[in-house]
Amino acid sequence: MRILLTNDDGIHAEGLAALERIARTLSDDVWIVAPETDQSGLAHSLSLSEPLRLRKISDKHFALRGTPTDCVIMGIRQVMDIKPDLVLSGVNSGSNVADDVTYSGTIAGAIEGTMQGVRSFALSQAYLYEDGARIVPWEVCETHAPALLEKLMVLDLPEGTFLNLNFPNCRPGEVDGAEVTMQGKLAFNLQVDARSDGRGFPYYWLKFGERAGAFIEGTDIHALKHNKISVTPLKLDLTDYSVTDRVARALGYGAQV
């Protein structure tokens, strides 16, 4: 089995090294095409205004000056001579749950793999933020991901569907199994931090305030809170079929779809 790895934290990220170790428990044909620098929060964006610079680090290991989406496209269409059987994106430093999925470059790696017709999974590891530092328990995903992936790889997923896996912030032995979940809802409470440079010109940072949400049973955020691995099926089709008829009636048309 041939596996392509990517991420959004960059080629030197600890989570990518963890993902490679995970992938090598499944196959000895593992390829990496990952961003040269941190691409967090760039979602499913393409580089259309700048050239893509590809750097070979070692056999089957490449860094690309581009987004996670660029990396998957280049991996499948340029770097690899044979299409991969599986795309794994991650392991992200921090969970990708609830509304995170709309911003996440990690999720985008799995989205692009799916669009390229390859079975794809996104993996993220929740962490503790303490005294201004991230404490990421990588051993959780490394312990539990291999067996989980072996089970999920044989699934007959519908076309356009991929899986979003999130591992809880706890010790490996404290993980209370895996749960199939739905996407939850979190308020980001994004804030704008206004500053001035040395010449008095303004510049800004976006930052997260305290995040709040309803930890409803069955959601990804509820699963993580209860030390469960969250497995959420996501799909490329963003159509809200529940309101198509109402929109059609508002426009004076008959029932649609």
Swiss-Prot record:
Q: Which gene encodes it?
A: surE
What are the leading ranks of the lineage?
Bacteria, Pseudomonadati, Pseudomonadota, Alphaproteobacteria, Hyphomicrobiales
Organism, as annotated: Rhizobium leguminosarum bv. trifolii (strain WSM2304)
Return any one Pfam family short name: SurE
- What function does the entry list? Nucleotidase that shows phosphatase activity on nucleoside 5'-monophosphates.
Describe cofactor binding as the record notes it: Binds 1 divalent metal cation per subunit.
Asked whether the keyword Ligase is assigned, the reply is: no
Q: What is this protein called?
A: 5'-nucleotidase SurE
Gene Ontology MF term list: 3'-nucleotidase activity; 5'-nucleotidase activity; exopolyphosphatase activity; metal ion binding; nucleotide binding
EC number annotated for this UniProt entry: 3.1.3.5
